[in-house]
Amino acid sequence: MFTGLCAFPLTPLHQQHLDEKAFIRILSRLTDTGVDSLGILGSTGSYAYLNREQRKRVVQVAKAHVGSIPMMVGVGAIATSEVLRLVEDAQQAGADALLLPMMSYQPLSAEEIFAFYEEVCRHVSVPVCLYDNPRTTHVTLADELQGRIAALPAIASIKIPGLPEPQASERVATLRRHLPARVTLGASGDALATAGLQAGCQVWY
């Protein structure tokens, strides 16, 4: 599922609850266009502002309406224990993959970041996409560290920030040297998707 177009829907809310009818309409518009996969509860889906029960319901509704289209679910949280609970919820609801950013209140060392991904990957039964999003998380992952994380068997893809050319080609080529061949790269951001794909990314996230 880590190739092609992975569409990330908004999560519409009404009075602090998921607006299920509006959400289903959004999902239907995406599935009707023939996207390759869906990214539920990404940054576009406002995952950081939803509690566990809200997230669980979002995933349940999505799974019931996406048919055979693969579904990746964001499980980002500050506490590792909460991430593991979200992982369990997403997998039980039928997630086909997990989107995992590094979120932290305190600055972390490279070893601490690696240990986090290693621990989470011990508890997954589906592939994981490493979410490199320093602008939002304020956590910068060095290329060497991303390479170490990507070597974990559960890691299948990396979502990186989009860049314009020629920076996109330079970024993809540099990062690719640190990654196993089986791990795909995907660019995020609508405006920069073309540059990312032309630079060698296999996915438009």
Pin down the residues of each PLM region.
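Active-site beta->alpha loop and helix N-cap motifs at the rims of alpha/beta catalytic domains
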Residues: 1-140, 148
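Catalytic alpha/beta core domains of metabolic enzymes, predominantly
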Residues: 122, 134-205
